């Protein structure tokens, strides 16, 4: 019979104490073993057993963690698992709850990866300052990948759809296995040295850490860092990271995304070109309008200063001067005609014959012959002086200098202006030595 002082526990209490002891005594543990009895119910959780030749332990990996597995758990697969020891109290089952699991062999690779990444990072190979920017317009692209993988199909499909004018050279290479890293490195160095390419793309599809190990090679990482040509790395899926991703100038999460990063969409380019053309047309029309306005202003200035315009101006001035000259000549002729008429009147008043008759009468009245002779001589001198004065103002003297007096035969009126005559009219022109009949052919004022 039990001692009354001993504590009596229920199964629940005992299992709870055992669970606390296990969880408190063991931190995270790594276990390498073989999978057995793998089940995945509708809940999405993963249940299986880890075993070796002599023992086994039940394991659970709940859905949030199991969905990130990079492989499909299957019977007999050797894995490396990390988790915490616990006790399932309802059944008293001792088990390991895992938060990470990878295929066996990846553990050593992961440690090697972490060590190499830390060393290259310390050397500055991952620094953003040394990375090159991608060119704005990629014209030639080198793609280093497997010629038969899904990655190359994805890349070429996206490139053909978005920008079919791109010149693409496929440099076929192994992307998995012992010789893959050396082959990729050699192709990269040759493509870079050729100077033919604007960008070099290194890519492959997803896989385990061991499958992707060629892209964690130190020689490849240093070749990417030393390349003069910008390098894009697109290895595996979005959750996969390799050293080539860290050291490359640009890391793309997938091969398809890498292709989209490298080339623009041709539809977007067409739209941009159309917008640029519309803008250019608008600017051309604006510039043409301004140029036409300037040309019109210059044409007006040129017309105002052209020889033809100046000749027209001079012609108008000549016509004006001609009209003024004709008007002044008519004024002069009118004044001369008035003076002629006045002279004729004076001539009639001082007709020598009349004066001579008067003088003769006076002479007859004078009886001294000598006095009469002197008087006659004096009167003759006066007569000559008057005759010279009359001759100076006589129209006949003007006519003698080359002018003509034009009159109408019908009434003897003097023609003073070209506007007074009509074509075909007959006129009389008085010259120095006679008169002539003339006929008007044309008139100009």
Curated annotation (Swiss-Prot):
EC number(s) per entry: 3.1.11.6
Name the coiled-coil region(s): none
Gene Ontology biological process terms from the UniProt entry:
DNA catabolic process
Q: Which reaction does it catalyse?
A: Exonucleolytic cleavage in either 5'- to 3'- or 3'- to 5'-direction to yield nucleoside 5'-phosphates
- Report the GO molecular function annotations: exodeoxyribonuclease VII activity; nucleic acid binding
Locations listed in the record: Cytoplasm
Instruction: Please give the chief subcellular localization of this protein.
Output: cytoplasm
Q: Does the keyword Isomerase apply?
A: no
The EC category is: hydrolase
For this protein, the record's CDD domains field holds: ExoVII_LU_OBF (cd04489)
Keywords (A to Z) from UniProt: Cytoplasm, Exonuclease, Hydrolase, Nuclease
According to the UniProt record, one GO cellular component term is:
exodeoxyribonuclease VII complex
What's the subunit arrangement here?
Heterooligomer composed of large and small subunits.
Q: What PANTHER family does UniProt report for this protein, alphabetically?
A: EXODEOXYRIBONUCLEASE 7 LARGE SUBUNIT
Q: What does this protein do?
A: Bidirectionally degrades single-stranded DNA into large acid-insoluble oligonucleotides, which are then degraded further into small acid-soluble oligonucleotides.
Q: Which family does it belong to?
A: Belongs to the XseA family.
Q: What is this protein called?
A: Exodeoxyribonuclease 7 large subunit
* Organism per entry: Xanthomonas euvesicatoria pv. vesicatoria (strain 85-10)
């Amino acid at each position: 019979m039990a001692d009354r002082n001993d504590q009596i526990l229920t199964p629940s209490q005992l299992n709870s104490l055992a669970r606390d002891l296990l969880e408190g005594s063991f931190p995270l543990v790594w276990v390498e073993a073989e999978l057995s009895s793998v089940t995945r119910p509708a809940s999405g959780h993963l249940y299986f057993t880890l075993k070796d030749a002599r023992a086994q332990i039940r394991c659970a990996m709940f859905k949030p963690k199991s969905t990130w597995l990079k492989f499909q758990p299957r019977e007999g697969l050797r894995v490396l698992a990390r988790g915490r020891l616990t006790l399932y109290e309802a059944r008293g089952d001792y088990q390991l709850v895992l938060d990470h699991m990878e295929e066996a062999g990846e553990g050593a690779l992961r440690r090697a990866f972490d060590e190499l990444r830390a060393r290259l990072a310390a050397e500055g190979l991952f620094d953003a300052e040394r990375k090159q920017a991608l060119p704005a317009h990629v014209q030639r692209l080198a793609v280093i990948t497997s010629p038969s993988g899904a990655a190359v199909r994805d890349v070429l499909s996206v490139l053909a759809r978005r920008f079919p004018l791109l010149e693409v050279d496929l440099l076929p290479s192994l992307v998995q296995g012992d010789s893959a890293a050396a082959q990729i490195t050699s192709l990269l160095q040759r493509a870079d040295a050729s100077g033919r390419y604007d960008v070099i793309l290194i890519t492959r599809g997803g896989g385990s850490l061991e499958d992707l190990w060629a892209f964690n090679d130190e020689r490849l990482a240093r070749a990417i860092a030393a390349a003069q040509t910008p390098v894009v790395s697109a290895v595996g899926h979005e959750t996969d990271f390799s050293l080539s991703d860290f050291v490359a100038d640009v890391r793309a999460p997938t091969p398809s995304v890498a292709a989209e990063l490298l080339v623009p969409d041709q539809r977007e380019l067409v739209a941009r070109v159309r917008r640029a053309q519309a803008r250019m047309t608008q600017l051309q029309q604006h510039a043409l309008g301004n140029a036409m306005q300037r040309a019109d202003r210059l044409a007006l200035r040129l017309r105002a200063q052209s020889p033809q315009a100046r000749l027209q101006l001079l012609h108008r001035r000549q016509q004006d001067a001609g009209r003024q000259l004709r008007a002044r000549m008519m004024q002069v002729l009118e004044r001369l005609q008035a003076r002629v008429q006045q002279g004729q009147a004076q001539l009639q008043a001082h007709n020598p014959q009349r004066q001579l008759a008067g003088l003769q009468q006076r002479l007859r009245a004078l009886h001294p012959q000598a006095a009469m002779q002197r008087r006659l001589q004096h009167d003759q001198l006066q007569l000559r002086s008057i005759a010279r004065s009359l001759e100076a103002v006589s129209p006949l003297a003007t006519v003698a200098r080359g002018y003509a007096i034009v009159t109408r035969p019908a009434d003897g009126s003097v023609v003073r202006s070209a506007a007074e005559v009509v074509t075909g009219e007959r006129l009389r022109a008085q010259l120095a030595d006679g008169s002539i009949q003339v006929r008007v052919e044309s008139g100009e004022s």
